[in-house]
């Protein structure tokens, strides 16, 4: 089962926390749609900023949005001008006061979502898929990952028949629930069709069964860089 299921969903409540943290009664569906809309908007608006995660909290009719990004300078802008414009746009979309936090990802090479998007962008630029995969694996292992696996599927290199290629280094224990396995997905839209990229990064084991363990570990790697 661990081979098939999304590794993040399987570990929620064990060593991962939810990306949407709020409680609602009859407005649940409306707020859920709003979350999806906000995430889609932020990913499109901040496509060049390397956004990995968007955490949404809703305390007392407000919204607190935390953006995990590899390039906080792109989000914040000159003298904080861009972040203020972004905050106003999000307030208009939610109809409530929005607090924005920007968290810098110090090691983007170890973030599965950013690695997947990077490989997808390289495939769109016609970089050889084996070279892109190998480079990503070497960078992750050099920066301290205990294991990484990358799957690329589709008409790789413009081949007539679609296929799936994978590359792995180290160990990626998908069945071990205490294992801190990060997972990311990207799609490359090439002239031959779409190619899917999946990335699993194993960063070590979290022994304490603490729902905040993921955030505690992330706090050591990342540093806040915004308001």
From Swiss-Prot:
Domain KH type-2: 38-106
One GO CC annotation: cytosolic small ribosomal subunit
SMART domains from the UniProt entry: KH
Record flagged with keyword Ribonucleoprotein: yes
Superkingdom of origin organism: Bacteria
Keywords for this protein: Ribonucleoprotein, Ribosomal protein, RNA-binding, rRNA-binding
Gene3D superfamilies: 3.30.300.20, Ribosomal protein S3, C-terminal domain (3.30.1140.32)
ATP-binding listed as a keyword: no
Job of this protein: Binds the lower part of the 30S subunit head. Binds mRNA in the 70S ribosome, positioning it for translation.
Record-linked PANTHER family: 30S/40S RIBOSOMAL PROTEIN S3, SMALL RIBOSOMAL SUBUNIT PROTEIN US3C
Family in the record: Belongs to the universal ribosomal protein uS3 family.
Subunit structure: Part of the 30S ribosomal subunit. Forms a tight complex with proteins S10 and S14.
Protein name: Small ribosomal subunit protein uS3
């Amino acid at each position: 089962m661990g081979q098939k299921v999304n590794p993040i969903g399987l570990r929620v409540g064990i060593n991962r926390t939810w990306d949407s943290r709020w409680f609602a009664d009859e407005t649940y569906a409306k707020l859920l749609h709003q979350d999806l809309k906000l995430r889609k908007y932020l990913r499109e608006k901040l496509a060049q900023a390397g956004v990995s995660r968007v955490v949404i909290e809703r305390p007392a009719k407000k919204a607190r949005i935390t953006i995990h990004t590899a390039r906080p300078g792109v989000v914040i802008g000159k003298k904080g001008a861009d972040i203020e414009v972004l905050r106003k746009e999000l307030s208009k979309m939610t109809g409530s006061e929005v607090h924005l936090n920007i968290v810098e990802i110090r090691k983007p090479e170890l973030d599965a979502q950013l690695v997947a998007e990077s490989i997808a962008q390289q495939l769109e630029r016609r970089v050889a898929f084996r070279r892109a995969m190998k480079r990503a694996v070497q960078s992750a292992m050099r920066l301290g990952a205990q294991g990484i696996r990358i799957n690329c599927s589709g008409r790789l290199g413009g081949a007539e028949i679609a296929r799936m290629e994978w590359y792995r280094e180290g160990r990626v224990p998908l069945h071990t629930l205490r294992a801190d396995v990060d997972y990311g997905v990207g799609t490359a839209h090439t002239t031959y069709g779409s190619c899917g990229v999946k990335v699993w990064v194993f960063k070590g084991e979290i022994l304490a069964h603490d729902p905040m363990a993921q955030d505690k570990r992330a706090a050591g790697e990342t540093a806040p860089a915004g308001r």
